Amino acid sequence: MKRTIIYICFVSLVTIICCIFNDEIVTLYYDAIRYFSNNDTTLEKNEYFREVDYMYVQNTSNYKPKNSKDIRNLFYTIINSGDDKFTFYCPRDYDNCLNDVKAIATNQTELSHINNFVHPFNGFKHIEIQYTSSGQVDVSIVRSYNDEEIEEISNKVEELYSRLVNPNMSVIDNIKVIHDHIINNSKYDTARSDYNMTTYKSDIAYGALIQGRAVCGGYSDAMALFLEKLGVKNFKISSDSHVWNAIYVDGVWYHLDLTWDDPVTSNNTDVLQHDYFMLSTSELHSKELEEHKFDETIYLEFKIQ
């Protein structure tokens, strides 16, 4: 409390001085803002925070970035935390900080890739990043799922998990059971993919698990929720036009694509396949390359195979 009062008094005093004196005082003022703000910064983490580091992004407690990688990790940690608003400040000795912030903030593809590494419930629908010439960076996030959707989906996952998962079966066999259930109880939402009709929330797990309609985002989010409960390390992986699951089992990363295992047929009959179940990258690309061509500089776990 004492420190907060001192800080408020200091800022008020320096604000008055800045109105009277020169740019050097203004610089001193902003340096003080950075010092107090960065030292008082805390990031609240919700229950869906992933205590997991990946090769492309890692959690960080460093809110004073020194390079572009620090900034990327900070954005990952902010999104991963589930916090809706967060502010950090560029250090004065990091000359290119704002340019590096802008490079990520204006690159929706990069932000979407970062989003693939967080728990579905912490993923964003929209992210706004604002910055000032003084080095203040404000991040505001609208999540993909609201509280009501999370509660309904979580209840459904709990119900299905207790019914479908057998502790006496292997992890892979349990993943296959869940894979089959999601496909057998969902249809691919062609109205959304072909005509942009949004009758269903098929781009998120709500469509797949509650409404029985899904596109690739819905299939992959639904699968990710069960993988979390199984304790299987995972993330989503995306190309320019598609998204699917990456899973880590017995020391190996695999591709898992429920969308392509639930093909659309000309007579609208339901088909369950396992053609895209637990594949290596070479196996995946031997089957289909155009929609599964991904950036190996981002999804580095597959580059080392």
Model-assigned labels for residue ranges:
Residues N22-D138:
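Intrinsically disordered, low-complexity N-terminal segments that are enriched in acidic
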Residues Y63-K64, G207-I210:
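Acidic, metal-dependent phosphodiester-chemistry machinery of nucleic-acid enzymes
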Residues S140-D147, V249, T259:
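Secondary-structure transition/turn motif
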Residues S193-T198, S202, Y206, R213-V215, ...:
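Catalytic cysteine-centered active-site loop
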Residues T269-Q305:
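Low-complexity, Gly/Ser/Thr/Pro-rich intrinsically disordered linker/tail segments
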Residues M1-I16:
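N-terminal Sec-pathway targeting helices
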Residues N146-A208:
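Secondary-structure boundary elements
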Residues G217-L284:
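Hydrophobic/aromatic-rich core segments of domains that either
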